[in-house]
UniProtKB/Swiss-Prot annotation:
It comes from Macaca fascicularis (Crab-eating macaque). InterPro entries: ClpA/B, P-loop_NTPase, TOR1A_C, Torsin, Torsin_1/2. It is a peripheral membrane protein. The lineage of its organism: Eukaryota, Metazoa, Chordata, Craniata, Vertebrata. The keyword tRNA-binding does not apply. Residues 91-251 are annotated as: Interaction with SNAPIN. It catalyses: ATP + H2O = ADP + phosphate + H(+). This is Torsin-1A. PANTHER family: TORSIN, TORSIN-1A. N-glycosylated. It holds the Pfam family TOR1A_C. Homohexamer. Interacts with TOR1B; the interaction may be specific of neural tissues. Interacts (ATP-bound) with TOR1AIP1 and TOR1AIP2; the interactions induce ATPase activity. Interacts with KLHL14; preferentially when ATP-free. Interacts with KLC1 (via TPR repeats); the interaction associates TOR1A with the kinesin oligomeric complex. Interacts with COPS4; the interaction associates TOR1A with the CSN complex. Interacts with SNAPIN; the interaction is direct and associates SNAPIN with the CSN complex. Interacts with STON2. Belongs to the ClpA/ClpB family. Torsin subfamily. The gene is TOR1A.
Length: 332
């Protein structure tokens, strides 16, 4: 970049030199400068380029989390600080690795979407954001060796093209044990792996594994008359990581990623209560352009099922199905 600027300056500020240069040579020199310096910048004005989005705004990320994610004070704080700190670190020692755990409908996928949108204009549709779904991309246990090779090649190729690549692994609880260990070299504290640096990449894992342990903690607080906001990360994180590591039905079962402490944060997503469902419904109404109708909000929330059976504290599907239930009341 600096070399291109210097070359352009010499050509513009030294007419005596320019006159002595053959027209063809001068044209080639100018073309080289324009192609190598100016063209990429013009191109990135009209198409997505790696790392071309404006600097990550802490305020914008916090606003998205506050307005779109409900009942998850732990996840909000961890995600905000971890992502903002990582993106603004010019020389991270390793990739950022986040493992999001909780029941369905609590916001795990939504958070990965928010992260992607705050880093790339295209969000989940960006060429630099890659989503893997265990049951879709890695369905057969007999093909684990093949999947490992393919996964390594895919990650290596995409990080080579864009150091700030984001990789999202959904349904980790359904992934075949041992498969995810194939990416261990990319998550470790290496400057280079076969000539490629992975230190600016982001890896996000989504899983239902450990949800029972998270629920136990939340229920204990509720039964003790404590506010869920009083739950601290230290109350859950260690027990969560141990639970996931020892869960034979989890893709992290005895994984070297956990054993070698390569997961930066185990992020617990608490089960949602009745009041949180109503928040989800209101936001969905607003996104569809409807005025908030509290009667409909209450009716939709009351149609959901809750657990434990006797106390009916937490929604068993979170906010996942409130959107389709809302369709019933706005059948155009």
């Amino acid at each position: 970049m600096k070399l291109g600027r210097a070359a352009l300056g010499l050509l513009l500020l030294a007419p005596s030199v320019v006159q002595a240069v053959e027209p063809i040579s001068l044209g080639l020199a100018l073309a080289g400068v324009l192609t190598g310096y100016i063209y990429p910048r013009l191109y990135c004005l009209f198409a997505e380029c790696c790392g071309q989005k404006r600097s990550l705004s802490r305020e914008a990320l916090q606003k998205d989390l506050d307005n779109k994610l409900f009942g998850q004070h732990l996840a909000k704080k961890i995600i905000l600080n971890a992502v903002f700190g990582f993106i603004n670190n010019p020389k991270p020692k390793k990739p950022l690795t986040l493992s999001l755990h909780g029941w369905t409908g609590t916001g795990k996928n939504f958070v990965s979407k928010i992260i992607a949108e705050n880093i790339y204009e295209g969000g989940l549709n960006s060429d630099y954001v890659h989503l893997f779904v265990a049951t879709l991309h890695f369905p057969h246990a007999s093909n684990i060796t093949l999947y490992k090779d393919q996964l390594q090649l895919w990650i290596r190729g995409n990080v080579s093209a864009c150091a700030r690549s984001i990789f999202i692994f959904d349904e980790m609880d359904k992934m075949h044990a041992g498969l995810i260990d194939a990416i261990k070299p990319f998550l470790d504290y290496y400057d280079l792996v076969d000539g490629v640096s992975y230190q600016k990449a982001i890896f996000i894992f989504l899983s239902n594994a450990g949800a029972e342990r998270i629920t136990d903690v939340a229920l204990d607080f509720w039964r003790s008359g404590k506010q869920r906001e009083d739950i601290k990360l230290k109350d859950i994180e260690h027990a969560l990581s141990v639970s996931v590591f020892n869960n034979k039905n989890s893709g992290f079962w005895h994984s070297s990623l956990i054993d070698r402490n390569l997961i930066d944060y185990f992020v617990p997503f608490l089960p949602l209560e009745y009041k949180h469902l109503k928040m989800c419904i209101r936001v969905e109404m607003q996104s569809r352009g409807y005025e908030t109708n509290e009667d409909i909000v209450s009716r939709v929330a009351e149609e959901m099922t809750f657990f434990p059976k006797e106390e009916r504290v937490f929604s068993d599907k979170g906010c996942k199905t409130v959107f389709t239930k809302l369709d019933y009341y706005y059948d155009d």
